[in-house]
Amino acid sequence: MRALRALPALLAAAALALCGCYSFSQTVLPSHLKTVSIAPAKNLTYQAAMGDKLTQGLPEMFRKEAPSLRQVNSQGQAEFEITLKSYTNTPHSYNSSGTVDEYSVAIVVDVEFRDNVKEETIYKGTGLRGSGIYSMSKGESEELHGQTRALEEIQQLIVNNALSGW
């Protein structure tokens, strides 16, 4: 009887132990995909350089998460297209005197990751959101602090979502 009571706890412990074991590896990726190209992001916002910043951070994240997938400038066996849909910088919190203490930068994108060999979509995401908060009270007076955090968050989300589709 005691053994039956302990079974759920043992199963839960085993599940928790295995949570950190999954990673993307060459055996997880489809064998027919060896190269990926990342097109420059289409930028529909008033932030002229934001599309370039978004695109530039993705190759390094891919190298970390999917090292067997080689990146090429064009005509990859897999292809990424990203559209930067919106960019906002809004007050996030106020201090006791009523002035803004923190701002939140938010970036919203649409993503399509295609398999050009099989001519099918691997992953499509619409309205993916990354945000970054920067604090005036911590001396972060420039929007760039929030942009950097928002870009890192959205880039990681894009890569994780695309690779989890495999």
Regions found by a protein language model. Give the residues of each.
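Surface-exposed short loop/turn segments
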Residues: 65-69, 75, 79-122, 130-147
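A structural "domain/chain start" motif
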Residues: 19-68, 75, 117, 160-166
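Positively charged n-region of N-terminal signal peptides that target proteins for export
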Residues: 1-5
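Mobile beta-alpha loop/short-helix "lid" or hinge segments that flank ligand
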Residues: 26-31, 124-134
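Bacterial N-terminal signal peptides
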Residues: 8-20
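Compositionally biased, intrinsically disordered linkers/stalks adjacent to structured regions
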Residues: 143-166
